[in-house]
Amino acid sequence: MPTAPPAVELAAPDIAPYAAGNTGIPYVTSFDSGRPGRHVLVNALAHGNELCGAITLDELFRRGIRPLAGKLTLCFANVAAYRRFDPASPTASRFVDEDFNRLWDAATLDGKRQSAELARARALRPLVDTVDLLLDLHSMQQASPPLMLAGLADKSLALARRVGVPEIIVRDAGHAAGARLRDYGGFADPASPKAALLVECGQHWERPTAELAMATAWRFLAAAGVLAPAEAARILAQPAKPQRVVAVTDAVTIANDRFEFTEDFRGLEVIARAGTVIAHDDGREIRTPYDDCVLIMPSRRLLRGQTAVRLGRFTA
């Protein structure tokens, strides 16, 4: 039986003051230091019901953040979905037509298919092509510990370690349903100097989720060289728990219309024995492939073609 969504403890900020931006793209603002350096992007609202990113960008604007070197861009991505957010029905505004974070490959962006999210992704693409370092702020359905999704490239793992939070780093290849923004172009290319991180800050509407998003953003900006050295050193010296790394080996993609887990998994459960049944996909048993298998982000959106859960193991 479906459970009621958690209480909404966060207030969706008014982002209308940022609509004009200064890039020619609505809701996208860039600050150029006039000095050589990297182009750093902090992205929020890939999904319209993930409030922590909007709260974080609103706070950065209010604090008058400016880069010491290079360029800093703050982007509210799926504004059309965000406008539909209703605390009385908080799960309904993830997207308008389709998932904004499954569109980021050349074939999809260059294709003929149309949707509200594709139109926005295509509008943002020229700017994203100029970005060197990306932090994409997200949150999760479940009340699960925060995760830093670093992809497979060593450069992004190194960046995640420099940021220092959250405690769990996940190395994964993404989803069969489509490419994420953090996997686009040079971000996922080991030969490119570009790097990207996607942080899942906690459950969508819990207060600590917004706090973690803000802390991660400040530490990312410090690690990226956006802040003055003394300020960056102060931020990065703040206590953080030792990080652990989960390497994802399998993504369970739903093949049929009747998929259900055997338990109410929330994420980061460690299943001791290989061969343990964790779900049924229209009668097909889904089993853990090895001992001490870690479940990453089990989904409540159990739809054909979508990722039900990722399976991994702790490597560090």
Pin down the residues of each PLM region.
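Structured catalytic-domain cores with a bias toward divalent-metal coordination
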Residues: 1-316
